[in-house]
């Protein structure tokens, strides 16, 4: 029996580190994905940067952001999962369960309006920092970033860029069906993505880092060496709760393999 117990412990250790992400941790609103094999050794995400109201495209950013706080509820001692809780002003509570999986990290959110009135909480912003991963600076890192269009995987420097907006810099890619009045007040591309994936290629060309949510407000190439797939909430009625799922993929540089993983998780 002692031998069997040792085998179980060994297999658990192997399973925990089977993929490139070996462990995760969350502290002071930063989610760190530790991945020793990839350039930079880890990927950090500002989680969460913001919860946002609708009508955001042509409005001062301060009027769009809904104040919130996030705290660590519980964490696995081996760094395989964390549980968080966000309290959003106006009576909204969000619980987050984030887990290491074989090809990255999974997110399961439940966001509930605990007030007696409808709340205009339209979308949220996790901000993934990719400067170390891509090995490039703010002016050119987007040349290693991509979305999927009708032409397939396309690097962002190959797409026409828009410059004019309430705030200059970056580029917003809006999925079909999302109101163009309700996204980031940065330049909005005329290119419509065909899925909810945005990602980038590592500086050594060996890895893809990508992110997606089942419901997405926007894909955003930002202004601090970051990329966003911003989950859509779509407002909450009094007492209403919604479930949202997301993924970070850290996989070998194979576009078809990434698409297969995305379709496994979210469908075509």
Ranges and model annotations:
Residues 19-72:
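Acidic-aromatic substrate-binding/catalytic surfaces of carbohydrate-active enzymes
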Residues 5-13:
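Bacterial N-terminal signal peptides
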